[in-house]
């Protein structure tokens, strides 16, 4: 069960992502802030997060560190991702294929009857696959491995260019 504070956080994150979506400009080779949200499987949760994308490094590569929080399935997760992303433009369509991955640090806290237990720190890795449009919209799938690292995350978000 998700607490009221978890619902408030999710609503605020969705509101801010929507606000940024309407004020966003073209997200290309500049650095950007990315707002994302979605669901995960194993554990079954909803999540919201933010990440920073570096300017292009050596052509197609970017470093994308990020943080997100997941709620549900008797568990609260805080994930810290450090991804190396490679981008492949798909012709003149404005769409780009994203692939990458990297290490994940997860902080897990049980809720419900085990709420009194301490937080646990775990490490793992993840692989990212997705698509991004030049206007900033993106969708991605993340496959993870390791203790308490979500096995599959499906999310959408918006990228806002930093000038």
Where on the chain are the PLM-derived regions?
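Extracellular loop and loop/strand-boundary signature of outer-membrane beta-barrel proteins
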Residues: 36-37, 69-71, 112-117, 141
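Outer-membrane beta-barrel "beta-signal"
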Residues: 149-163
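Short, exposed beta-strand-loop hairpins at the edges of beta-sheets
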Residues: 141-148
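Residue-level detector of the transmembrane beta-barrel scaffold of outer-membrane proteins
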Residues: 32-36, 62-66, 96-100, 138-140, ...
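Cleavable N-terminal export/targeting peptides
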Residues: 1-30, 162-163
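Residues that define the transmembrane beta-barrel architecture of outer-membrane proteins
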Residues: 31, 44-48, 75-80, 95-97, ...
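Gram-negative (and chloroplast) outer-membrane scaffold detector with strong preference
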Residues: 49-113, 135, 160-163
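An anionic, turn-rich surface loop/hairpin at beta-sheet edges
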Residues: 104-128
């Amino acid at each position: 069960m998700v607490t009221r504070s978890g619902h408030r956080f999710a609503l605020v994150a969705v509101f801010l992502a929507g606000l940024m979506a309407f004020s966003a400009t073209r997200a290309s080779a500049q650095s950007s802030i990315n707002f994302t949200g979605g669901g995960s499987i194993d554990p079954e949760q909803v999540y919201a997060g933010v990440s920073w994308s570096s300017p292009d490094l050596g052509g197609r590569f970017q470093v994308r560190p990020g943080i997100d929080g997941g709620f549900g399935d008797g568990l609260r997760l805080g994930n810290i991702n450090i991804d190396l992303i490679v981008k492949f433009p798909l012709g003149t369509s404005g769409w780009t294929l994203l692939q990458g991955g990297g290490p994940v640090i997860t902080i897990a806290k049980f809720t419900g009857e085990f709420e009194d237990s301490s937080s646990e720190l775990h490490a793992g890795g993840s692989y990212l696959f997705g698509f991004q449009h030049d206007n900033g919209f993106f969708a991605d799938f993340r496959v993870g491995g390791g203790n308490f690292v979500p096995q599959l995350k499906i999310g959408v978000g918006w990228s806002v260019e930093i000038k």
